[in-house]
């Protein structure tokens, strides 16, 4: 650990600087699928990953250094940096090793598993660093904007990093999932969306009943514009979709139960509409949980605005995302990762519609990856300009003082 701390304090290592000059190579779900299904070759995957993984790590490691020093000096952020440095150096050992050696391929597989496990707690640990920073230095709008920009890119990079590793380890690790034998790595070529909806609902329902002893029911409706009367299927990563749906169901259930806690005749159902068109697959989750004021919608996706109580990371440093208020922003990153999105439409006093948009075609579902370049650098260095729209004063003017003299 001392070595990594020393390295972190040095100027950008030449290898990190060199790899960060390359842009990541985004893949589509179709490319993931075609490679895993038709011509899965461990040598080819190895040769791609031994370059691509360091590129993605180096891009985000360069960007970390643009954060405010007061944030970089938080122990939790330093710990995350040490993990990234260690993983980068371990992957770099395979830069020139021959793919023709079976032992090299096996060792590389084991390194990928070790790296993935090392990064398991990146999200809560980085969140801990943000909390430490906010508690000590307070809230600054400009710095908050930069932290929001960085964390969206940092966590997206992590999602992509794990996607690449999972595909390689699942395809070449020798462990076929008996529950999902038709999956290509972590991708389901015929993902039944309604089934994932119901699985996510049941999991959220179980938690809701544990805490509140009750839970709203679920109503699901499908509309398949491409093939009427057929169940909606999509080529997708079920674990990503489950993550998004579980978070939205959890929020809808909590809002509904808390609003109608004194009601004796039951609760309004949470309604889900799944639609498939030519371009988009959309999933709308609607509740009657009272809604959210318009001014608070953006805050729900802001890492610095979290009002959740500070969770403990001991003894394993692991913590649920919801404990940091990161559930919604991370879910939106999962949706955006393959060119989709997650949006909230709320009517205060009534309820909220949450809509997940996914690409209907796997050939259009390309990874959306952050790139470290001059545009990114300028985002951190440009000072905020004065607002060019009027802002209401905290103390409105007395209009009577400005009456025209007769």
UniProtKB/Swiss-Prot annotation:
Modified residues (N6-succinyllysine): 278
Induction / repression: Up-regulated in response to hypoxia. Up-regulated in response to fatty acids. Up-regulated by PPARD.
Compartment(s) where it occurs, according to its Swiss-Prot or TrEMBL record: Mitochondrion matrix
GO biological process, one term: cellular response to glucose stimulus
Consequence of substituting residue 121 to N: No effect on kinase activity
CDD domains noted in UniProt: HATPase_PDK-like
Coiled coil segments of this chain: none
Residues annotated as domain Histidine kinase: 131-362
Gene3D superfamilies registered for this protein in UniProt: Alpha-ketoacid/pyruvate dehydrogenase kinase, N-terminal domain (1.20.140.20), Histidine kinase-like ATPase, C-terminal domain (3.30.565.10)
Name of this chain's protein: [Pyruvate dehydrogenase (acetyl-transferring)] kinase isozyme 3, mitochondrial
Record lineage: Eukaryota, Metazoa, Chordata, Craniata, Vertebrata
């Amino acid at each position: 650990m001392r070595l990594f701390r020393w390295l972190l304090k040095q100027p950008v290592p030449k290898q990190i600087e060199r790899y960060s000059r390359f842009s990541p190579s985004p893949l589509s779900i179709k490319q993931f699928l075609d490679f895993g299904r038709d011509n899965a070759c461990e040598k080819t995957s190895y040769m791609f990953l031994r370059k691509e993984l360091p590129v993605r790590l180096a891009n985000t490691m360069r960007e970390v250094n643009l954060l405010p020093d007061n944030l970089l000096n938080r122990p939790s952020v330093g710990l995350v940096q040490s993990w990234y440095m260690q993983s980068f150096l371990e992957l770099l050992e395979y830069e020139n090793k021959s793919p023709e050696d079976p032992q090299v391929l096996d060792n590389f597989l084991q390194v990928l598993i070790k790296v993935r496990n090392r990064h398991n707690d990146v999200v809560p640990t980085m969140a801990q660093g943000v909390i430490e920073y906010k508690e000590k230095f307070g809230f600054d709008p400009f710095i908050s904007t930069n932290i929001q920009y960085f964390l969206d890119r940092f966590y997206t990079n992590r999602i992509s990093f794990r996607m690449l590793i999972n595909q390689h380890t699942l395809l070449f690790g020798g462990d076929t999932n008996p529950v999902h034998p038709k999956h290509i790595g972590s991708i389901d070529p015929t993902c039944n969306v309604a089934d994932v909806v119901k699985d996510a609902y049941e999991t959220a329902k179980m938690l809701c009943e544990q805490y509140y002893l009750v839970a709203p029911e679920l109503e699901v409706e499908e509309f398949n514009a491409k093939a009427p009367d057929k169940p909606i299927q999509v080529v997708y990563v079920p674990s990503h979709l489950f993550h998004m749906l579980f978070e939205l169901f959890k929020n809808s259930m909590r809002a509904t139960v808390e609003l109608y806690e004194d009601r004796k005749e039951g609760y309004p159902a949470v309604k889900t509409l799944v639609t498939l068109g030519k371009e988009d697959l959309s999933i709308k989750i609607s509740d009657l949980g009272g809604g959210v004021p318009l001014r608070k919608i953006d805050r729900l996706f802001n890492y610095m605005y979290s009002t959740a109580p500070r969770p403990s990371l001991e003894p394993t440093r692991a913590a649920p995302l919801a404990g940091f208020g990161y559930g919604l922003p991370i879910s939106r990153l999962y949706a955006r990762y393959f060119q989709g999105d997650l949006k909230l439409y709320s009517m205060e006093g009534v309820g909220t519609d949450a809509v997940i948009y996914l690409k209907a075609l796997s050939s259009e579902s390309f990874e959306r990856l952050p790139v470290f370049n001059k545009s990114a650098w300028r985002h951190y260095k440009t000072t905020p300009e004065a607002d060019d729209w009027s802002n209401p004063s905290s103390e409105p003017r007395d209009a009577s003082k400005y009456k025209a003299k007769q």
